[in-house]
Amino acid sequence: MDSFEKEINTTFLKLNIPFVDYGITSSDSISLEGLFRNPEFPNLSQNRNQLFRMASMTKPLTAYLTLALLDDYRIDLHESVGTYLPEINNLKIAYKEGDTIKYKKNDVPISFHHLLSCTSGNAYEHHDPLVSELVSKKEVAPMKNGDDAFLKAPLVFTPGSHWSYGVSYGWLGKAIEAISGITLDENLKKYLCNPLGLKQTSFNP
């Protein structure tokens, strides 16, 4: 493994990554684990006890929680999310006609399947030029605000017709809370963290 570790450390250094805690595991063992510390960042806290933001790695967790909850509550995967979150029915579809952004009504109910598969019509501002333009014009709140305001961004296509990386998992989080009556973090602990003994894993409050 020495040559492999040397290779990945060289790669991390070329990419100017400050710190990496890495490992290779199977279902029952750890075959490799290591730490990469970039000497260009000597003041950065670099230890295995620090917490990391998981960013979009929270999506698989949210997907698992969604499927577990749908199973517990006997909710069909293709049922409309609007049954539990009426506000999602208010999202319109944005499109461009020349240089003008226009809107039309969405007549296709957004299902749990649409949200899970990123085919709901939701898009991130850094993935879709139309949403990016709306953010730049201050017609849509930017994601960096860190609140739910960006969920009000319009759809960019009819649900089920295309694929786009976007805020559909934000809507799933809200649906999980609406169905269960408890927070997303409480659901995470109930279905995943407690059964697996994960004591330092949580969603941000």
Predicted regions, residues:
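Active-site SXXK
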Residues: 5-8, 28, 53-81, 172-177
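Short, conserved catalytic-motif segment at the N-terminal edge
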Residues: 2-53, 74-76, 90-97
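Proline-centered turn/helix-capping motifs that create local helix->coil transitions or kinks
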Residues: 29, 123-127, 200
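Flexible glycine/proline-enriched surface loops and loop-helix/loop-strand junctions
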Residues: 46-49, 99-100, 153-159, 168-170
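Short, solvent-exposed loop/turn and secondary-structure capping segments
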Residues: 33-35, 126-130, 204
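Short, contiguous, pocket-lining structural segments
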Residues: 142, 160-168, 180, 184
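Active-site helix/loop module of the DD-peptidase/beta-lactamase fold
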Residues: 48, 71-122, 152, 179-205
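Amphipathic alpha-helical interface segments
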Residues: 129-144
